[in-house]
Regions:
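A short, well-structured beta->alpha microelement
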Residues: 44-53, 373-394, 401-404
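Hydrophobic targeting/anchoring helices
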Residues: 62, 106-110, 126, 134, ...
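Active-site-adjacent "subsite" loops/lids of carbohydrate-active enzymes
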Residues: 25-50, 79-134, 140, 144-149, ...
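Structural motif
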Residues: 33-38, 67-70, 98-99, 139-142, ...
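Boundary at the C-terminal end of the N-terminal hydrophobic targeting segment
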Residues: 19-23
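Bacterial N-terminal signal peptides
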Residues: 8-18
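Bacterial N-terminal signal peptides that target proteins for export
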Residues: 1-8
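A conserved amphipathic helix/loop scaffold
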Residues: 375, 384, 388, 400-622
Length: 622
């Protein structure tokens, strides 16, 4: 009898456990982060019940991170255990979280990691958290901006970057990881890296050593409003996941989005969620509990382009009353409903997409120069795949000023070109590493500038663009795309895309405007030629204006997304052998039109697609 009961139990578990593992979404997990301020309030059962009802009636969540400390508020043991028990009763997985700030409102005031009292408190918080959880995550602020007298003295003759990299790596191991594991040997300590990766080294985030000492990493994919403090481009929400996946393969837990940018429109918030998942993040964490239950729906989030009626996210449908599983009518009240609808819609697509592929771009650890440039390139339709090491086996790769300090820079380029492949470097890299690169081609980029708006046969820009002048020897290298003011009938012209022959390969220089945002002003035909040159490893490239991005996958699928406020007509360009594209969500087929390529270029197939504002479409091709 006992044997039969055991087998029956095992059979039941075999059925139930996969369903539990699957959660509320088919292709990823959705979690939520609760700040210490809100976790502390969870001691009040009424507050906990009422706020959870607001969220859970509109949004399906699989997991919650309960923060134990922020701004010197340490949540008591009893409150943490009560919250854990409450969410377990709802079928929600729990983990811990720590924000190491002294006063977030005071310019994100951080701990001073040479201060003995601060160090003791940092350790005590880690031990307190490990007591309650088998996993906890460090929110954005495990860095230091402290410049108190003691910290200045401790730095000595080192640069701030050198000192902080060493200090925060030491603090991570000795104050957080080791003490936590001594309290709870099962605990996994995860570090969440924020979205400002190109500035990490200056505040102590060590992307070389950090991912090796922590049990895992997480990725900040918040891009919010590009006009606000960090000026991050939409594409970063995708690009940073890919970069961190390449930093720590198999150990990047997911992406992290907050409500920032929703003031622009519902679509700006939706894009951050959507792009995070397009990068194939296994989980997304929503910051935060107080926003999801407290930020009410606002009519101003309904952008004017919603009147077109065929955008990817329909505001009116998303906020309309709906029936829950029990047949009750739910009237949406907060941003939580937008989150749920966008993620479920994205979930329907994700299972059809393979692994992301893109144009390889090397970024050296702790490098400076042309910060965040790859995100601007992503916004002009160049699919980016950033790597912490040099790409191998590629027909072409991109090097920016972030490669300037590599002592092997010229030899790596030489190797690539000798194998009959190509390299694209930016004007910023030529300026930063002019002497090294002169062994490849004697180009100069100094402080000379040019104002351009006429790209000749490649069109005109609507605004003047300030570019660095790339100087070269006549007949040693050649302009592929040129610009002047004017160029046709003008007096001067300057390279936008430049080409030099070297061994069996092509060495290209891409001119980057002083203001990276003016890449968006490059005419469509100029962008098409840049994409053609840089997309040699890819099956598809774009013929489109700027602010249209392309996402490619290794199973011959793609997503193309319009970030403009107006509709665009674009072409997906392929070699002639690709005949048909099929819409992954609507099963509509489009046929390619064979057209002549550029000067001395073979014919190509053009697949016409019309994209409404802030809208994506997905296709398979063969």
């Amino acid at each position: 009898m006992k044997t039969r009961k055991l087998f029956a139990l095992l059979a039941a578990l075999a059925f139930v456990l996969p369903a539990m593992a699957q959660g509320n979404y088919k292709n990823f997990k959705v979690s939520m982060y609760a700040r210490a301020y809100e976790v502390d309030k969870m001691a009040d059962q009424h507050w906990l019940d009422s706020t959870w009802t607001i969220i859970s009636s509109q949004l399906k969540v699989d997991k919650i991170y309960l923060e134990t400390h922020r701004d010197l508020l340490i949540v008591p043991d009893a409150t943490l255990e009560k919250a854990k028990k409450f969410f377990a009763s709802k079928g929600i997985e729990t983990a811990g979280g720590i924000t190491y700030t002294i006063n977030e409102a005071n310019n994100f005031e951080t701990f001073c990691y040479s201060n003995p009292e601060h160090r003791a408190l940092v350790q005590r918080i880690a031990e307190h958290t490990a007591k309650h959880f088998n996993e906890f995550i460090l929110d954005d602020f495990f860095f230091t901006s402290c410049k108190e007298d003691g910290e200045i003295d401790a730095k000595g003759s080192k640069s701030w970057t050198e000192y902080r990299l060493e200090k925060m790596t030491e603090a991570g191991k000795n104050l957080v990881i080791d003490p936590a594991k001594k309290v709870n040997p099962k605990v996994k300590v995860i570090i969440k890296y924020p979205n400002w990766y190109d500035h990490f080294q200056g505040l102590g985030f060590n992307l070389d050593k950090g991912p090796k000492i922590f049990d895992g990493i997480w990725t900040g994919t918040e891009t919010r409003d590009p006009g606000s403090a960090q000026h991050l481009q939409n594409y970063l929400s995708y690009n940073i996941i890919r970069y961190f996946n390449n930093l720590a393969p198999g150990r990047n837990g997911g992406g992290w989005v907050d409500a920032g940018g929703i003031n622009m429109s519902m679509d700006r918030y939706a894009e951050q969620l959507h792009l995070t998942m397009l990068a194939k993040a296994p989980e997304i964490s929503l910051f935060a509990y107080h926003q999801l239950c407290g930020i009410g729906l606002q009519s101003s989030w309904r952008a004017p382009w919603q009147d077109l009626g065929n955008t990817s996210w329909n505001y009116d449908k998303i906020v309309a009353p709906f029936k829950d599983a029990k047949g009750n009518t739910i009237t949406p009240s907060t941003m939580a409903v937008i989150t749920d609808r966008v993620l479920h819609q994205t979930d329907e697509l994700m299972g059809k997409l393979g692994n992301p592929v893109g144009i390889n771009s090397f970024k050296a650890f702790h490098s400076r120069g042309e910060a965040f440039l790859q995100n601007y390139l992503g916004m002009i339709g160049l699919p980016m795949e950033m790597l912490p090491s040099y790409p191998t086996g590629k027909k072409v790769f991109l090097l920016t000023a972030q490669a300037a300090n590599d002592p092997d820079l010229a030899s790596k380029i030489d190797q690539q070109l000798r194998t009959g492949n190509d390299v694209v470097v930016t004007s910023g890299l030529v300026k930063a590493a002019q002497d090294k690169l002169s062994t490849i081609c004697e180009l100069q980029v100094n402080d000379l500038k040019a104002m351009v708006n006429d790209f000749g046969r490649h069109g005109k820009s609507e605004r003047d663009i300030l570019i660095p002048q790339v100087l070269y020897y006549t007949n040693d290298s050649w302009e592929v795309v040129s610009a002047g003011r004017p160029l046709n009938g003008g007096t001067s012209g300057y390279p936008i895309l430049h080409r030099a022959l070297y061994s069996k390969g092509n060495y290209y220089v891409l001119t980057i405007p002083d203001d990276f945002g003016q890449l968006y002003d490059y005419p469509r035909a100029a962008l098409k030629e840049i994409r053609r040159v840089m997309s040699q490893d890819l099956d598809v490239y774009l013929d489109a204006p700027s602010k249209v991005s392309l996402f490619l996958y290794d199973n011959k699928t793609l997503v193309v997304e319009n970030f403009n406020d107006t509709p665009v007509e674009i072409n997906l360009v392929t070699e002639p052998g690709i005949k048909t594209m099929t819409n992954l969500l609507e099963n509509e087929k489009i046929q390619g039109e064979l057209q002549a390529g550029g000067w001395r270029q073979p014919k190509e197939n053009f697949f016409k697609v019309i994209l409404p504002p802030h809208t994506y479409k997905a296709y398979s091709y063969k």
